[in-house]
């Protein structure tokens, strides 16, 4: 898997979570953040750091 070089868009964050079949709270737990942090990433209020994105993809196998 090639490492991403730009933060994911809010739509990508939501699509990856939904593809993994997770709620926002459960997705946050996967990468050790609270529900509100995940909500901010999906709403576009804040950008998801690449380290969290890569960790989420690895742990949910979304990076294949």
Q: Residue ranges of each PLM-predicted region?
A:
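Short alpha-helical DNA-recognition segment
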Residues: 21-39
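A short, Lys/Arg-rich alpha-helix, primarily the initiator
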Residues: 1-19, 57
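DNA major-groove recognition helix of helix-turn-helix/homeodomain DNA-binding modules
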Residues: 32, 46-64
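Residue-level recognition of hydrophobic positions within alpha-helical transmembrane segments
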Residues: 13-14, 35-38, 50
């Amino acid at each position: 898997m090639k490492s991403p070089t730009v933060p994911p868009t809010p739509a990508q964050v939501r699509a990856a979570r939904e593809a993994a079949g997770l709620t926002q709270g459960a997705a946050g737990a996967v990468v050790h953040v609270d529900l509100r942090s995940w909500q901010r990433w999906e709403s576009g209020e804040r950008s998801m750091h690449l380290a969290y994105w890569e960790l989420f993809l690895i742990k949910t196998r979304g990076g294949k």
